[in-house]
């Protein structure tokens, strides 16, 4: 079943999550119409290869054209219109940046896999629960309702201001008319009546001025209250969701809704400011004793201006945190002299600002003594913001060609001698701009989440561990001295994040049994719901009896899955995290030949399989093959190893002991679609292949002594050519072959 078909069968709460990350960048109509084709392309690789991305974009447009041709025959006018519009938008938006469409589609597919994994989890973790609180959704609806109410109130005061202007014009006309009369006419009854009318009009004007100012004061109060409570809380929640998304959590959303709220409030405040200026003009033309406008207007204008400044300062955000295109799942880790991308957004989208706002990027602008290392940003570090071409286009700017460069220290060498490891040093990228609008000049500044600077890719795993720990442990976006005294993390939160590493990086998260095994590896307690873990135990202290840390072990497994067993992992056929004790408990009552796949606890980046059989006396026996590492898996795909694996035992003919994947799935049914070649057959030495050579293949073979329940060591896997093996079988007895394989030279 395709991934998209699985998505469509999700419950409504998960479908709502899917709906949130499909927009004009990658419309859901395209995902639906081209589901299978999209899933068959390597978008992640294309996100780092411009040539490949260009080809995929062209092929995507060709696929769209084919769909257009099909629906044209069906005369589906609405779908034809939508497809033409989508094609035009895609071609215009990504023509100059094809790698971006690859990033967008890759992120969408990865997020689908994360949601599918979450749907299969029995419970959500504490972090994800906190992000999906019903009270948060209720607050968002309240914010939108209050913003709309403020906008409506400002429209009403606009009418009041216009009415005051009309009333004052009429009063002014009547008053001047009386003033131009002859002295003899001013004593007439009609004039006296007109004077009374003017007095009533003046009283009404005074009342309406006070009423309008009172309404405006109330609007200012409500706006102030909204901005400093619910709206700021919404923004802080979005920033927290962004933090969590950076370390593999649910894709953050809601920025478009915030943009609508910020923009409407800004429009309302500027409109209110113009109304106050209009009232000042009216008061200048006509004032009187007790006129409320001169007494209140200045203070009110100051409050409105302050709110505008405050709104703009909060509206300048980092929409997409710094990330190297070569490592899209490892944001906030930057390598010297390697380009990274970062995107800024102004949540107040006013047409007057299009191409008028220039943003400057710098690094460690406000930092003086936190690190001996100093950096500068090379490349284009000043760019203008523009409104994107989409239905809800944002006013944004993306820096794509920035490179961090380390400066030499004053001592003449590179400064790495601080109190922290390089991967524990936190740095900040700052962005500055200035808004000039309607007579106001507003200086804005915002910063990225803390980043870790590395000079060698080998530092990436530990740097990523620092990013994980920081963003799990704190909401503070600028605590650059965090690792002076890193706080412990709750084990339940940390395990949830570990599952996110697998769902975001290799397409499938961890289930409760797998997480339980990790908890036992991290702590001796059997229940991990309320435990805590220190930074040192997670990333710096070696595991008991091992020469590596927990994080190094886990990162090596992620790398192994990504490069060598990804399809098997995504299909759920790798149990992976299971202890030897639990492994035997699971297998002991199963049919002979039942096996499972688990990650080695003693070898970095190793995977092994264990199968069960019975001795002649009926005794249950377990056999675990020496773990396969990336070196061995580079020579032979793991699925092919499972298919071709042979065991030589006593006088028996070599046979494959692997029959059923736990619990009872026939091996070929589970792995058949992943086999990369035909089964290996042993050729006779006299058989000739192309150009007269004897065909040769690698066969994974283990020897097991008849009196042992464990595979032989040091070499339980011996690749040999079929011709050599055939010669051995013809000229030597099985006992002699076994003796030879026990030789210390056989492992060389």
Curated annotation (Swiss-Prot):
It comes from the Eukaryota. The modification Phosphoserine is found at residue 721. GO terms for cellular component: chromatin; cytoplasm; cytosol; nuclear body; nucleoplasm; nucleus; RNA polymerase II transcription regulator complex. The modification N6-acetyllysine is found at residue 667. Acetylation at Lys-667 is required for JAK2-mediated phosphorylation and activation of STAT4. Tyrosine phosphorylated upon IL12 and IFN-alpha activation, but not by IFN-gamma in T-lymphocytes and NK cells. Serine phosphorylation is required for maximal transcriptional activity but not for DNA binding. Phosphorylation by MAP2K6 at Ser-721 is required for full transcriptional activity induced by IL12. However this serine phosphorylation is not required for cell proliferation although critical for IFN-gamma production. PROSITE patterns: SH2. Pfam families: SH2 (PF00017), STAT_alpha (PF01017), STAT_bind (PF02864), STAT_int (PF02865), STAT_linker (PF21354). Keywords: Acetylation, Activator, Cytoplasm, Disease variant, DNA-binding, Nucleus, Phosphoprotein, SH2 domain, Systemic lupus erythematosus, Transcription, Transcription regulation. The modification Phosphotyrosine is found at residue 693. Transcriptional regulator mainly expressed in hematopoietic cells that plays a critical role in cellular growth, differentiation and immune response. Plays a key role in the differentiation of T-helper 1 cells and the production of interferon-gamma. Also participates in multiple neutrophil functions including chemotaxis and production of the neutrophil extracellular traps. After IL12 binding to its receptor IL12RB2, STAT4 interacts with the intracellular domain of IL12RB2 and becomes tyrosine phosphorylated. Belongs to the transcription factor STAT family. Forms a homodimer or a heterodimer with a related family member. Interacts with ARL2BP. The SH2 domain interacts, in vitro, with IL12RB2 via a short cytoplasmic domain. Interacts with STAT1. Interacts with JUN; this complex efficiently interacts with the AP-1-related sequence of the IFN-gamma. This is Signal transducer and activator of transcription 4.
């Amino acid at each position: 079943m395709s991934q998209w078909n699985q998505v469509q069968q999700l419950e409504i709460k998960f479908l709502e999550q899917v709906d949130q990350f499909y927009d004009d960048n990658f419309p859901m109509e395209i995902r639906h119409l081209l589901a299978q084709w999209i899933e068959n392309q390597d978008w992640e690789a294309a996100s780092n290869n411009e040539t490949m991305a260009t080809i995929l974009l062209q092929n995507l447009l060709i696929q769209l054209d084919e769909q257009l041709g099909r629906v044209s025959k069906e005369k589906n006018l609405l779908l034809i219109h939508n497809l033409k519009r989508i094609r035009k938008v895609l071609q215009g938006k990504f023509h100059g940046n094809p790698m971006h469409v690859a990033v967008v589609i890759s992120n969408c597919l990865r997020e689908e896999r994360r949601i599918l994994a979450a749907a299969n989890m029995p419970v959500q973790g504490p972090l994800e629960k906190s992000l999906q609180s019903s009270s948060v959704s209720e607050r968002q609806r309240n914010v939108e309702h209050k913003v709309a109410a403020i906008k409506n109130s400002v429209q009403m005061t606009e009418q009041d201001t216009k009415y005051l202007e009309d009333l004052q014009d009429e009063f002014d006309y009547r008053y001047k008319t009386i003033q131009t009369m002859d002295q003899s006419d001013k004593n007439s009854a009609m004039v006296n009546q007109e004077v009374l009318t003017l007095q009533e009009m003046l009283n009404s004007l005074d009342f309406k001025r006070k009423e309008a100012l009172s309404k405006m004061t109330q609007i200012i109060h409500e706006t102030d209250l909204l901005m400093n409570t619910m709206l700021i809380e919404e923004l802080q929640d979005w920033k927290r969701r962004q933090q969590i998304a950076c370390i593999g959590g649910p894709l953050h959303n809601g920025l478009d809704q915030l943009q609508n709220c910020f923009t409407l409030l800004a429009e309302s405040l500027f409109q209110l400011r113009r109304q106050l200026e209009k009232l000042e003009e009216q008061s200048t033309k006509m004032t009187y004793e007790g006129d409320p406008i001169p007494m209140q207007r200045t203070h009110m204008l100051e409050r409105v201006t302050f709110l505008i400044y405050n709104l703009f300062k909060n509206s300048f955000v980092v929409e997409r945190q710094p990330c190297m295109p070569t490592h899209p799942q490892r944001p906030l880790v930057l390598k010297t002299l390697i380009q990274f991308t970062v995107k800024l957004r102004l949540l107040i989208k006013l047409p007057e600002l299009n191409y008028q706002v220039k943003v400057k990027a710098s690094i460690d602008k406000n930092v003086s003594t936190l690190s001996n290392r100093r950096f500068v940003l090379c490349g284009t570090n000043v760019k203008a913001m523009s409104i994107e071409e989409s239905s809800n286009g944002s006013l944004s700017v993306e820096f794509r060609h920035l490179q961090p460069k380390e400066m030499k220290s004053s001592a003449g060498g590179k400064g790495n001698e601080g109190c922290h490891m390089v991967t524990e040093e936190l740095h900040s990228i700052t962005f500055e701009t200035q808004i000039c609008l309607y007579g106001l000049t507003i200086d804005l500044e915002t910063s990225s989440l803390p980043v870790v600077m590395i000079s060698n890719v080998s530092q990436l795993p530990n740097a990523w561990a620092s990013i994980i720990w920081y963003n799990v442990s704190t909401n503070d976006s600028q605590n650059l001295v965090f690792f002076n005294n890193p706080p412990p993390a709750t084990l339940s939160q940390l395990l949830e994040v570990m599952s996110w590493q697998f769902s975001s990086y290799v397409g499938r998260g961890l289930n409760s049994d797998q997480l339980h095994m990790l908890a036992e590896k991290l702590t001796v307690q059997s229940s991990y719901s309320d435990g805590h873990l220190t930074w040192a135990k997670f990333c710096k202290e070696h595991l008991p009896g091992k020469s590596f840390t927990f994080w190094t072990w886990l990162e090596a497994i992620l790398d192994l899955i990504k490069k060598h067993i990804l399809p098997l992992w995504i299909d759920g056929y790798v149990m992976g995290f299971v202890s030897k004790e639990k492994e035997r408990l699971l297998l002991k009552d199963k049919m002979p030949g039942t096996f499972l796949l688990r990650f080695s606890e003693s070898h970095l980046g190793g995977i092994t399989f264990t199968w069960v059989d019975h001795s002649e006396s009926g005794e249950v026996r377990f056999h675990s093959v020496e773990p396969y590492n990336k070196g061995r898996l580079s020579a032979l795909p793991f699925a092919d190893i499972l298919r071709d694996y042979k065991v030589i035992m006593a006088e028996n003919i070599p046979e494959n002991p692997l029959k059923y994947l736990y619990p009872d799935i026939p091996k070929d049914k589970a792995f058949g679609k992943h086999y990369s070649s035909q089964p290996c057959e042993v050729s006779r030495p006299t058989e000739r292949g192309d150009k007269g050579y004897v065909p040769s293949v690698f066969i994974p073979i283990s020897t097991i002594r008849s009196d042992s329940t464990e595979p032989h060591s040091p070499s339980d896997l011996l690749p040999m050519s079929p011709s050599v093996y055939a010669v051995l079988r013809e000229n030597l007895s099985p006992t002699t072959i076994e003796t030879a394989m026990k030789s210390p030279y056989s492992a060389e």
